[in-house]
Amino acid sequence: MATINDHYLKLKAGYLFPEIARRVNAFAAAQPDAQIIRLGIGDVTEPLPAACRTAMIKAVEDMGDRSSFRGYGPEQGYEWLRQSIAEHDFQRRGCEIDASEIFVSDGSKCDTGNILDIFGDNNTIAVTDPVYPVYVDTNVMAGHTGAANEQGEYAGLVYLPVTAENGFTASLPEQKVDLIYLCFPNNPTGATASRAHLQQWVDYARANGSIIFFDAAYEAFITDPDLPHSIYEIPGARSCAIEFRSFSKNAGFTGTRCALTVVPKTLTAKAADGSEVEIWKLWNRRQSTKFNGVSYIVQRGAEAVYSPEGQAEVKGLVSFYLENARIIREQLSANGLAVYGGVNAPYVWVKTPSGFSSWEFFDKLLHTCHVVVTPGSGFGAAGEGYFRVSAFNSRANVEMAMQRIREKLAT
């Protein structure tokens, strides 16, 4: 009989968001007239920018003309898109990133999991706690962990607690670790990292031969000019970091799918024989074998993000969601809750009222206010007693959700 990958059996009962969906669906079936407002999963609600739509429509027409038809594209992405990304997102910020070091993909979630294909099974891996669950679950699937304890912490991972006391920014690990996951602006806490903080991580990684996986999916929400948007703004990062980015939240591509991973050609890791190997070559080989590239139509839409019209429209989308975050943050704070994040970030991290666990308060908000949030414990043991609120929704829904909470859950 065929056998399975037994590491999947170590995963907790359900990925966080499917469990949320199960509870919401059960409630909706029991209360079909309830008007549920979803402020849980970070899916956007506003339409694609007009510049992107126009470019994609033209690209569709290109595909209908023999002279401009495109078949298989380059696995790494079309050069015209990679050049635009390199110039606007990196070079204009002083980052020495070349278009050849950029890999266009269909999602940063995919890339943060797939990147493990090119790394060995004997690496020590560090994650913050709480943390985006994909970082942990993909390592479990790959066989990099032992079993989980009662708190959901997996043996073999190094957990770095982030709390209100440390500003939700992790301290350097006391032990040597090989692979480090960092996400700023952070999901789920909404915390941001200063240049000095990231410099500490870069210095640690270079001193220990570590590699940082830097998730910058929410960098567009940074409005503070003193905060870095990319790990490559930090001296030395080219030799120790891989960066992941996405068009999902800034340009509304959650249903269109386009992202990118930056792998500097100066980044190396050791082979079993002790020789140093270029990570870029391994990732290029992996993508060429397992990935056929993002569609021409979608890449033309992503390219339009960097047009003057696209830049203005993306700025408008980001400002819209940041205003939602401000409303959420201020309303929940006025309701007596301890609130974090929501500044330079689209997520608000909130302490549950005394006596409530994360899931208990999730259920209370769902059943009493018909509002869906994300329980903090789903992001790790240190997330217990918190919940995450997403700013990705319509203004009317955000205001209505806050009104319901204010009226029905006055503390």
Curated annotation (Swiss-Prot):
Q: Does the keyword DNA repair apply?
A: no
> Which Pfam families does the annotation name?
Aminotran_1_2 (PF00155)
Catalysed reaction equations from the record: (2S,6S)-2,6-diaminopimelate + 2-oxoglutarate = (S)-2,3,4,5-tetrahydrodipicolinate + L-glutamate + H2O + H(+)
Domain of life of the organism in this record? Bacteria
What EC number(s) is this enzyme filed under? 2.6.1.83
Where, by residue number, does substrate bind? Answer: Y15, G42, K109, Y132, N187, N292, R388
**Cofactor(s) the protein requires to work:** pyridoxal 5'-phosphate
> Which positions does UniProt annotate for pyridoxal 5'-phosphate binding?
Y72, S108, K109, Y132, N187, Y218, S246, F247, S248, R257, N292
Keywords, comma-separated and alphabetical: Aminotransferase, Pyridoxal phosphate, Transferase
Q: Which GO terms describe its biological process?
A: lysine biosynthetic process via diaminopimelate, diaminopimelate-aminotransferase pathway
Where on the chain is N6-(pyridoxal phosphate)lysine found, per UniProt? K249
Its biological purpose is as follows: Involved in the synthesis of meso-diaminopimelate (m-DAP or DL-DAP), required for both lysine and peptidoglycan biosynthesis. Catalyzes the direct conversion of tetrahydrodipicolinate to LL-diaminopimelate.
Subunit? Homodimer.
Q: Which family does it belong to?
A: Belongs to the class-I pyridoxal-phosphate-dependent aminotransferase family. LL-diaminopimelate aminotransferase subfamily.
Q: What is the protein's given name?
A: LL-diaminopimelate aminotransferase
What is the gene name?
dapL
